[in-house]
Amino acid sequence: RYFDTIRHSVLLDKIAKRIQDPQVMGLVKQIIKAGGSIGVPQGGPFSPLAANIYFNELDWLFDAIRRKTAEGEYEAVNYHRFADDLVITVSGHHTKRGWAERALQRLQEQIAPLGVELNLEKTKMVNTLNGEAFGFLGFDLRRVRKRGGDGNFILMTPKKKARKAVQAKIRDIIARGGATPAAEVVNRINAALAG
């Protein structure tokens, strides 16, 4: 829904802060206004650029928060965004309690004037120290203890839905394999695994 909610007037104001040439702005207006007064078509070459322009100030805000909360090389609050998918991580140290709630509040304050709302089904706070996972860009991420028990690392695994889809493709490749040489079947399976 994010791409459908981008307000053209807000997007044009943000672009006009950087582009002074009236001819270029006229061309940009034609591109943006082609579909009405709200939304940009997903999948086109302009939509990723529009998404980044629309959230540029949000990116700068969370970069400032990241720098402000840094302790040496350790960052207490981190922000990662790809188009309309984003994740904010907060260190689990007991002195940082409440930071996640404040980060979520700041996020909501920043996106409300843009006409963007959080997807409440996908918005959640998790404690990775307790083994909880969170999803981002088709992957589940969870904190896992290193072998030998010395420290942790973040394990990324494809979401269950994606794994099932790949398994179904592999079953189909094998079922249709018939007299196909094994090397060719392996190549097809590898292509399915690579996506």
Language-model segment annotations:
Residues V10-K14, D85, K169-I173, A192-G195:
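A general alpha-helix detector
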